């Protein structure tokens, strides 16, 4: 696009050349381009579109500029501003497509743009005038919807156009294919250009809204024009689609269908509402309707779920040859989807997609790429609605229970609970028995009566997040209890950290009033889902929820196949959905609609509380639990002879929990988007902010499914073949769930899929069953696996790129004034999303660098009007995980998108660049006076300094969130809150005695002349201070802290140290070379991930060489090795690393005991763990963590474990120099060297090759000694 390139300002032309791989990127290019972007008017980006000669069939209808009168969409009801549906659907409560212009007053700095007229806001807040309140609500919610972006969409469009202005140069890999995307053929870009013609006045483009740090400001149109808010949302959707279309190499035909849907939504009465109604269209026409015609074939993986299934180990066993007998038997979704599209006059786009889909009868790389591309068309907008409406819509629901539990099913009351009579049968009996059995196990398990485990439970909700603090304070004040304040500590007052300190010295029985305190409102905006309100409980409410959490955790760990217990997505879920979707398996996706609202005291909670209370009877009735004492309760099971008896602390907690659940919660709503909307709303809905919520739902989900499979279905279905299938099904083998989400795996018979008739009968039976106890099962049988918003088709993962929108980001609060460096973390997360979603890696890398360039520059103006600014060097982003496109002396695009971040990535880059650096320094710079441990006499450090490597390296590690300045807080107040948090943590004197003993013994041992193992080890005494620090970090930083951050950052960049960290300098002594390509782990014709195909070569090579079934994920990359759980505030990985470090340094057994006592463990548990600490027992990665090496998240979808073991060589005879061989006593060096080898192999684009240590500067023994010295100094 020569014309587009020539239209760019000269600094951006230079950046475009660098991102095309024509010239190396330099700090000068980077800084000049960033400066240009920040000073030029945003509208110039739209002007660039004038230089693209579009040729697409898109025609933007004038109806997108029509306005619905906002005053008809809002009304005051019961002194609340509410969104009034304008069509016959109560869900029509989203931002209307209305003109915002008449509500605006001009900004002094940008007179063409404005904000809500102060008179309107004054009338709304002071006079409470109804029309003004409605106007204010419309303005604020419309502005919030516009703000759901990472930064102004115009900027993101600018990044795309800069990438498209210059085609990239070939990389040298024979598989490198140029992009087929032509901007002139982009319907999304063409639509943007057409839309903006309406906003062109006197030759100047005006965006409908400008997104600024504090929100959005809106264009004030001239007479005769409108500014309909939905046009801004339309532009956001179109820009998002244009980016994804380029990054996926999407066909213009498919892109056109997405554009037409967005235009239709913009022409409707409400853009967001219409998109929500059509959110399932694109998945239904692609993922859920593939391969329904004859001629089906191709290859799919053969995956085995090894026994026992509870271990979640899967392995690739070969290839399944697909044929018509394995073709999906579920009906396509075409008919119901076309009906939806017909309603919105979009049936043509359905026919276009169906025609394109029918061109892919066989399962191959092209067909799954088609599915991925169609799913990417769904809008990625975070949907906003008035928080008031979220509460009224979601928290007023009451489940319709067809088979309620009659009053006669219960015993007389035991305090606040009742027990289910033995004569009662059915699902309620099974639910009761399951929870009672699990409660008995908890009551009899000594580990839960250990003070450390109880402290872990008490600490899990002590976080910087909010937790209804004002309501807690008010509820206790009514009873005469005044909580202490720590105003001068600068700890965030609304945090649970602050709450925990306040109640630490107050006996539980005096805090009971707080159990019924109101719960304040939180809000979460979501992609493709309704915004949902959340209920953050206070610390007392969380505390009494502990039994609920404990028992549910036991059910999930020991009784079902849940994925909540210690799992990560890549550990269990991805292999699971791949397995489930592979023929001849039949999979059903199960979701419980409105699950929170379906868990009420009328059925579930009364059963659960009674069951837990009865199960806890087997425990010691005099035992306290988590500081809750034993109490006396009136047992009136016998109305003739009621009596009082003691109950344990656990049972006391259940008593209060039952009382709370029976009464329901009161939701304190303070809607910041609606002036005057403050009200209290009673609800029976289960609180989304409880620590028990997810695990509780999981336990119920599995328990009710168990009864269905074992009892209900066999007695209700008629089909003999279905009855036979059900006899082999259990929740331990066939049902996996998490929260309200589940996946049902049906066994096949003789490699034949279950019949459609049997499936329909089973699913009808399941729907009817759920209605017995008020559940609405949303069942999807489409021969695809969907679980936790991850998708698979025929054993191939389908990334849902629309859920990781390049433009979108959630902002739930009306004020979103973030400090600039936080944008850098957004850039890195954005880049990683594109790697995980397997976007075309070279184009995505170019886009990420454009985004990084813009975000590298930022400023701050303090309340006094003083300005501060800073500019990050480009090497900062290399350290953070974005690989360079072209380095001097190299060819472009040779660094893989799987390059690890941090020192591992820097080692890998420098290891491959080493020879050129030494050669270039030797010929252009004088030699060093003294031999450098890594570079010899070549003055490479000066060369790296000239390239800005050191400046970028150190700037990357500089803090990006302002630090609380010590002088802003009173030391007395800090000491007081720390003391109270210490009291909260060490409420049990036995725990404190353990930690004191551990600290005393450690200090005695570490000061011994004969024990040189360093002095810093984790301790439970550190935790209160860490809580205070976290609470201060959560508070909005004062201007002085922001100024200090800018000053410190600029000092770091301008005067960097001319060396790397001690560890990286040691890593660089290791020379790694690559050998032959490793044998392919997977048939290259088998699709593993949509988009990882020959057209996207680096992803394809990595997946075919390594495979996507992480056979050893838990073994190699488990979060903990020796210590399972620690108190919130301690890092379990840091504890494990400390223990391994001590083992490497030869510490005696008593040193391990002291460390473990110091984190709260009893002597017996400490001795057990100390006896297990062995370097031989540790896995590779866990030993490597001692020196801060790890497995980056981008590798976790790959089976890298076997590579590390079998293809990364720390020593290979004939290649590795003898001096690089580790001695037997330094056997711990091997994992470190192997991970460095793997890091380098994964950083090179192309096939994965063997990696070999060839030499170690100074010898392996010297490196080992230096690493030991570093360990002692940590």
UniProtKB/Swiss-Prot annotation:
Gene3D superfamilies: RNA-directed RNA polymerase lambda-3
Enzyme class: transferase
Occurrences of domain RdRp catalytic (ranges): 561-798
KW Nucleotidyltransferase (keyword) present: yes
Gene Ontology terms, MF aspect: hydrolase activity; nucleotide binding; RNA binding; RNA-directed RNA polymerase activity
GO biological process terms, semicolon-separated: viral genome replication
InterPro entries with a match to the protein in the record: DNA/RNA_pol_sf, RdRP_5, RNA-dir_pol_reovirus
Record's catalysed reaction(s): RNA(n) + a ribonucleoside 5'-triphosphate = RNA(n+1) + diphosphate
Statement: the UniProt record of this protein carries the keyword Nucleotidyltransferase: yes
Superkingdom of origin organism: Viruses
Pfam families cross-referenced by the UniProt entry: RdRP_5 (PF07925)
EC numbers for this chain: 2.7.7.48
Keyword field: Hydrolase, Nucleotide-binding, Nucleotidyltransferase, RNA-directed RNA polymerase, Transferase, Viral RNA replication, Virion
Record field: transmembrane: none
Main location: virion
UniProt-annotated location(s): Virion
This protein's GO CC annotations: viral nucleocapsid
Family listed: Belongs to the reoviridae RNA-directed RNA polymerase family.
Stated role: RNA-directed RNA polymerase that is involved in transcription and genome replication. Following infection, it catalyzes the synthesis of fully conservative plus strands. After core assembly, which consists in recruitment of one capped plus-strand for each genomic segments and polymerase complexes, the polymerase switches mode and catalyzes the synthesis of complementary minus-strands.
Protein name: RNA-directed RNA polymerase VP2
Organism annotation: Aquareovirus C (isolate Golden shiner/USA/GSRV/1977) (AQRV-C)
Classification lineage: Viruses, Riboviria, Orthornavirae, Duplornaviricota, Resentoviricetes
């Amino acid at each position: 696009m020569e014309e587009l390139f020539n239209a760019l300002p000269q600094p951006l032309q230079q950046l475009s050349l660098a991102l095309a791989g024509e010239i190396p990127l330099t700090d000068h290019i980077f800084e000049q381009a960033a400066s240009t972007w920040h000073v030029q008017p945003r509208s110039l980006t739209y002007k660039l579109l004038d230089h693209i000669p579009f040729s697409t069939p898109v025609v933007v209808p004038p109806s997108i500029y029509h306005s619905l009168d906002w005053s008809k969409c809002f009304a005051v009801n019961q002194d609340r501003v509410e969104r009034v549906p304008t069509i016959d659907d109560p869900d029509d409560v989203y931002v209307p497509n209305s003109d915002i212009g008449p509500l605006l007053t001009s900004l002094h700095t940008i007179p063409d743009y404005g904000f809500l007229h102060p008179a309107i806001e004054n009338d709304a807040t002071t006079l409470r005038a109804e029309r003004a309140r409605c106007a204010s609500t419309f303005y604020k919610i419309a502005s919030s919807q516009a703000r759901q972006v990472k930064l102004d969409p115009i900027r993101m469009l600018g990044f795309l156009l800069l990438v498209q202005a210059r085609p990239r140069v070939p990389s040298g890999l024979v598989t490198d294919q140029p992009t087929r995307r032509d901007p002139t053929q982009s319907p999304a870009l063409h639509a943007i250009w057409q839309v903006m013609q309406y906003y062109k006045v006197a030759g100047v483009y005006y965006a409908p809204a400008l997104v600024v740090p504090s929100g959005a400001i809106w264009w004030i149109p001239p007479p005769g024009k409108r500014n309909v808010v939905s046009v801004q949302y339309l532009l956001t959707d179109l820009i998002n689609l244009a980016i994804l279309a380029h990054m996926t190499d999407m066909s213009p035909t498919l892109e056109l269908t997405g554009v037409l849907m967005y235009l239709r939504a913009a022409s409707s009465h409400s853009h967001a509402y219409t998109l929500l109604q059509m959110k399932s269209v694109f998945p239904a026409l692609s993922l859920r309707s593939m391969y329904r015609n004859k001629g089906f074939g191709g290859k799919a993986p053969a995956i085995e779920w090894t026994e026992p299934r509870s271990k979640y180990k899967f392995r690739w066993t070969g290839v399944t040859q697909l044929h018509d007998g394995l073709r999906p038997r579920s009906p396509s979704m075409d008919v119901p989807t076309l009906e939806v599209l017909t309603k919105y006059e979009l049936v043509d786009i359905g026919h276009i997609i169906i025609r394109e889909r029918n061109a892919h009868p066989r399962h191959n790389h092209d067909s799954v790429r088609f599915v991925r591309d169609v799913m990417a068309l769904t809008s990625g907008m975070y949907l906003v609605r008035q928080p008031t409406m979220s509460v009224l819509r979601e928290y007023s629901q009451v489940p319709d229970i067809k088979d309620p539990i009659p009053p006669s099913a219960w015993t007389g009351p035991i305090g606040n609970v009742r027990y289910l009579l033995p004569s009662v049968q059915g699902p309620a009996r099974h639910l009761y028995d399951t929870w009672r059995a699990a409660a008995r196990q908890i009551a009899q398990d000594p580990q839960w009566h250990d003070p450390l485990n109880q402290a872990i439970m008490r600490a899990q909700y002590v976080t910087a997040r909010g937790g209804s603090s004002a309501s807690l304070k008010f509820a206790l004040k009514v009873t005469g209890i005044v909580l202490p304040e720590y105003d001068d500590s600068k700890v965030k007052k609304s945090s649970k950290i602050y709450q925990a300190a306040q109640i630490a010295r107050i006996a539980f029985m005096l805090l009971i009033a707080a159990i019924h305190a109101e719960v304040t409102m939180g809000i979460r905006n979501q992609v493709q889902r309704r915004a949902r309100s959340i209920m953050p409980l206070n610390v007392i409410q969380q505390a009494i929820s502990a039994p609920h959490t404990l028992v549910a955790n036991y059910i999930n760990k020991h009784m079902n196949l849940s994925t909540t217990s210690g799992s990560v997505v890549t550990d269990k879920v991805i292999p699971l959905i791949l397995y489930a979707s592979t023929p001849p398996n039949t999979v059903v996706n199960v979701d419980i609609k409105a699950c929170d609202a379906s868990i009420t005291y009328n059925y579930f909670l009364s059963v659960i509380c009674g069951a837990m209370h009865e199960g806890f009877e087997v425990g010691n009735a005099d035992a306290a639990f988590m500081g809750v004492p034993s109490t006396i309760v009136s047992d009136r099971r016998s109305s003739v002879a009621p009596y009082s008896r003691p109950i344990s602390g656990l049972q006391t907690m259940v008593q209060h929990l039952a009382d709370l659940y029976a009464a329901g919660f009161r939701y304190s709503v303070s809607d910041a988007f609606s002036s005057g909307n403050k009200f209290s709303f009673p609800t029976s809905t289960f609180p989304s902010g409880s620590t028990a919520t997810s695990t509780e739902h999981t336990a119920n989900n599995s328990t009710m499914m168990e009864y269905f499979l074992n009892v209900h279905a066999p007695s209700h279905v008629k089909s003999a073949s279905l009855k036979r299938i059900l006899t082999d099904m259990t929740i331990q083998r066939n049902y996996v769930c998490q929260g309200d989400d589940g996946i049902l795996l049906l066994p096949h018979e003789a490699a034949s899929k279950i019949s459609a008739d049997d499936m329909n009968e089973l699913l009808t039976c399941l729907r009817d069953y759920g209605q017995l106890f008020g559940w609405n099962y949303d069942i999807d049988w489409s021969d695809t696996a969907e679980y936790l918003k991850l998708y698979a088709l025929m054993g191939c993962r389908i990334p849902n790129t629309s859920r990781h929108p390049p433009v979108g980001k959630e902002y739930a609060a009306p004020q979103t004034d973030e400090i600039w460096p936080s944008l850098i973390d957004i850039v890195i997360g954005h880049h990683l999303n594109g790697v995980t979603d397997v976007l075309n890696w070279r184009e995505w890398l170019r886009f990420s660098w454009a985004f990084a360039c813009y975000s590298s520059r930022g400023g701050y103006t303090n309340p006094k009007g003083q300005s501060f600014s800073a500019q990050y060097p480009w090497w900062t982003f290399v350290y953070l995980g974005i690989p360079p496109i072209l380095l001097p002396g190299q060819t472009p695009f040779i660094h893989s998108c799987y390059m690890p971040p941090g020192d591992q990535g820097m080692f890998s880059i420098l290891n491959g660049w080493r020879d050129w650096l030494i050669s270039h320094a030797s010929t252009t710079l004088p030699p060093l006076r003294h031999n450098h441990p890594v570079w010899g006499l070549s003055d490479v450090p000066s060369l790296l300094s000239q390239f800005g490597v050191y400046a970028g390296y150190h700037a990357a590690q500089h803090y990006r969130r302002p630090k609380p300045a010590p002088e802003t807080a009173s030391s007395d107040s800090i000491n007081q809150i720390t003391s109270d948090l210490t009291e909260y943590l060490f409420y049990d004197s036995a725990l404190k005695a353990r930690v004191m003993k551990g600290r005393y013994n450690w200090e005695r041992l570490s000061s011994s002349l004969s024990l040189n193992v360093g002095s810093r080890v984790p301790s439970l005494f550190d935790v209160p201070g860490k809580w205070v620090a976290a609470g201060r970090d959560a508070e909005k930083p004062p201007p002085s802290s922001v100024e200090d951050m800018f000053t410190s950052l600029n000092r770091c960049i301008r005067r960097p140290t001319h060396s790397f960290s001690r560890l990286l300098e040691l890593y660089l002594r290791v020379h790694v070379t690559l050998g032959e390509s490793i044998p392919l782990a997977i048939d290259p014709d088998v699709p593993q991930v949509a988009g990882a195909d020959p057209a996207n070569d680096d992803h394809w090579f990595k997946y075919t060489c390594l495979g996507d079934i992480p056979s050893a994920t838990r073994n190699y990359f488990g979060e903990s090795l020796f210590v399972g759980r620690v108190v919130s505030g301690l890092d379990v990985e840091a504890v494990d690393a400390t223990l391994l470090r001590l083992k490497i340094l030869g510490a005696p057994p008593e040193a391990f005991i002291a460390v473990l006592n110091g984190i709260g463990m009893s002597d017996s548990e400490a001795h057990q763990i100390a006896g297990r600490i062995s370097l031989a027992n540790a896995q590779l990665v866990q030993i490597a963590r001692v020196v801060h090496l790890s497995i980056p998240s981008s590798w976790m979808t790959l089976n890298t474990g076997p590579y590390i073991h079998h293809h990364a060589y720390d020593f290979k005879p004939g290649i590795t120099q003898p001096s690089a061989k580790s001695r037997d006593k330094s056997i711990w060096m091997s994992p470190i060297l192997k991970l460095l080898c793997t890091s380098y192999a994964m950083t090179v684009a192309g096939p994965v090759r063997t990696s070999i240590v060839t030499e170690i500067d100074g010898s392996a023994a010297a490196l080992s000694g230096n690493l030991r010295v570093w360990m002692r100094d940590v």
